[in-house]
Amino acid sequence: MESKILDFYEYMKKAVEKLKSYRIKETLIIHHDDADGLCSSAIVKKALERENFTVKTICLEKLFPEIIEKLHSDEGKIFIYTDIGSAHAEKISEKNKSKNLTLILDHHDFTRSKDPMVYNLNPEIFGISGEKEASGATVTYFFAKILNKQNMDLAYLSIIGSAEIPGPISGLNKEALKDALEKGLVETSKSRFGEDYKISVLGKPLSYKRISTMLSVLGSVGYYEGGPEKGIKVCLEGLNPTIEKFIGKLEEKRRIANQKMLEKIRKEGLIQLKNVQWFHAYDNFSGMGTKVIGSFCSYLSFQKIVNPKKYLVGIMNMQPTIPGYGSLTKNYVKISARTPKLLGQMIGEEKKPPLSKILPEACEKNGGFGDGHSVAASGVVLKGKEKKFVEDLDVLGGK
């Protein structure tokens, strides 16, 4: 095993020891809303319950600064962030001030923890790629395995969480796959796209990619209908006809909303600026989580209606309520941005700035925040600031 993986394990062991010695047994898990986030939450929930912790979960689409502030104003608590949080480790440290034990199990871009009570358990810090070699669920799985070897029976969730990473399973994800195969939780099969993995412990054997899609639908489209909780239940107890019917209903709901949005854009076109093309969905996706606008933008970026050299931006209204948490103090809109293929190549050649640089900056200018990758990013801005945001992004995109 590579030394960087061993270094990462050693740091995890310290966090596990701290958790075991902590006097409090109530834990709040804050997790992301996609399949990786649901799998991560399910792993740590089950692992902690086996150690007699009481566990609550909150599913977040974005980690709002005001949520960090409210949670970490408390004292003597245990907070575990899964598949979310690393980008905000510095902010979490500032607000936590060693008052609570905080573990961040994530694989996204990170800021560094400045608080010894905030453990930023991210493979990226140790030179392991979170984009290619380690999903959030894999990070969480190895944490659970160090906590108790019994948790190796959760290795299949690491594989489902890894489905979002393109290409063959590699790196730390492959180490988890070895465990899953050894335990008979996963079966290898061939598909026309190459190697496939069938998950054999959730009822009927299904491809890990199909289960990943189903969980993401529950977490995003079903965000306001108890979808994330239902998704965690699927992760641990398997599929049944009732949940499959519910997933089918959500997929149809999204398909109708996507179709309606596409027809409107084909009829009216996108609003064109010098470097940005954009649309506002308003309440087209009402009742669904905001991840749906990102999925729609990804699809739209491949359509002929899109200018291949301009950043593509979609905006939708957001509900101020977060299930299991309460209401945000401000009204925001969700921003999703994608780059068409040609623009993506230009960014790769450093002829155009990456979204990961310009989108957060434009969001911050308009009362919000953002994060993401070079060709796909998202954020929020204050409601009413949409036009100013796209104008700011347009200027930044021309630099």
Predicted ranges, named:
Residues S220:
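P-loop NTPase catalytic phosphate-binding loop
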